[in-house]
Amino acid sequence: HQQFHCPSAEGNQVKKVFSCKNCDKTYVSLGALKMHIRTHTLPCKCPICGKAFSRPWLLQGHIRTHTGEKPFSCQHCQSAFV
């Protein structure tokens, strides 16, 4: 963090900042910016109701609300849950 704000005397390098075009957030890596952009584009859409999500695993969990699937169970009482 300090290297970003106070470049060393030997390098005096200014790190590139990646800015989101949809909001005022900035990132020090392109990968982090790409992950953030998904919060604006919501590329994962539910085929049943159309609700959109930024991450595939969020969609996967949502689909269980339609199917009623409860993939996890208590090892003591066998009660199932999402």
UniProtKB/Swiss-Prot annotation:
Q: Does the keyword DNA-binding apply?
A: yes
Task: Tell me the keywords, alphabetical order.
Answer: DNA-binding, Metal-binding, Nucleus, Repeat, Zinc, Zinc-finger
Q: Which family does the record claim for this protein?
A: Belongs to the snail C2H2-type zinc-finger protein family.
> GO CC terms on record?
nucleus
* Protein name in the entry: Escargot/snail protein homolog
- Please give the superkingdom of this protein's source: Eukaryota
Q: Recorded GO terms, molecular function?
A: DNA-binding transcription factor activity, RNA polymerase II-specific; RNA polymerase II cis-regulatory region sequence-specific DNA binding; zinc ion binding
Recorded source organism is: Calliphora vicina (Blue blowfly)
Where is this gene product found? Nucleus
What's the chief localization of this chain? nucleus
Q: Which SMART domains match?
A: ZnF_C2H2 (SM00355)
